[in-house]
Amino acid sequence: MSHTTHPYQKELEVATLAVKRASLLTKQLSDSIVQTARSGTLTKDDKSPVTIGDFASQAIINHAIKLNFPSDEIVGEEDSQELQENSSLADQVLSLIIKIQQETSVYNDVVGTLTDKNKVFQSIDYGNSQGGSKGRFWALDPIDGTKGFLRGDQFAVCLALIEDGKVVLGVIGCPNLSENIVSNEEHSGVVGGLYSAVKGVGSFYSELFKEGTEPLSQQKPIKMQNHTNPSQLKVVEGVEKGHSSHSTQAEIKAKLGFDPTTVAKQTVNLDSQVKYCVLASGQADIYLRLPVSDTYREKIWDHAAGNILIYESGGQVGDVTGAPLNFGNGRTLDSKGVIAANKEIFDKVIDAVTEIRKSSTPRV
């Protein structure tokens, strides 16, 4: 299928502009939080900035989807109850939305505008779909990587289209991701990346804060590397130890033959689905997210867009057994953990995980 002819042209345009608008809003908010924190006026327990960002981002994107595809359902992370019970918070959310709509008014014809609180509430609550294995729905994470967002570090706005349980389109806006983040040069390249994938077409990179949309034929195709030598491999993992088992992941790297003296330099810790983007663009080779408990189930919005980005860039994604992730099971994945890697090394990673699982407690 060519870059210019695919059946998701309109969906990609809407998703791109909505994610761009939401990314700009969340970037501005994140930057202001960091400034406030530096001045000492933001307390550690103050969750309102990220709450405002989550609500505003979800409202913008859900509204754009429903405006263009009224029969589509959306699986979103938030609902509007807290906002409806807090008038001050709702005012702040609406104010931010109106401001960003004015700044990106060239997008209004495609993604629409929100002008009152009731419409904001309604748009947020469009995200109440339960998903499933039949039909068509979108999966949205309005701010993926809350801690990174609050630190002014990595976070992402993630949107995927799922048809009959299969991801067919993904768009990830990474406001603080530089094009060559894993290189030795500190934050080299353009900051702010948009990563897109369409089933059967490929994965692509473009500048997030460049106005408008470019056809895929004008975007930069991205491909995973096929490194297999342990000395060449780079691993991306989460920052938060509560989200994945770093100790088990260390065992896996040892089993794969990583040199203990260099393994730290070969491991990159990043928040959010930014990890998938780094992998898909060939800057890393393995993504490890091993479960911290036997009962934890991943949310589909945390992985759907990243999943197609990896496949369309030539990689492979699975759970700890190597089985593909199932996005037709409702709002959560019925699987343990997530592992992504280039196709040359994927089976070896799964073999290492299997060996460690056999010799460990049932948790892994």
Swiss-Prot record:
Keywords: Amino-acid biosynthesis, Hydrolase, Magnesium, Metal-binding, Nucleotide-binding. Mg(2+) 1 binds at residues 77, 141, 143. Its cofactor is Mg(2+). Pfam families: Inositol_P. Mg(2+) 3 binds at residue 77. The active site is at residues 54, 146. Adenosine 3',5'-bisphosphate binds at residues 146, 243, 272, 275, 289, 302. InterPro entries: DPNP (IPR006239), Inositol_monoP_metal-BS (IPR020583), Inositol_monoP_superfamily (IPR051090), Inositol_monophosphatase-like (IPR000760), Inositol_monophosphatase_CS (IPR020550). Mg(2+) 2 binds at residues 141, 144, 302. GO terms for biological process: amino acid biosynthetic process; phosphatidylinositol phosphate biosynthetic process; sulfate assimilation. Its EC number is 3.1.3.7. Signal peptide: none annotated. Belongs to the inositol monophosphatase superfamily. This is 3'(2'),5'-bisphosphate nucleotidase 1. It comes from Candida albicans (strain SC5314 / ATCC MYA-2876). The lineage of its organism: Eukaryota, Fungi, Dikarya, Ascomycota, Saccharomycotina. The gene is HAL21.
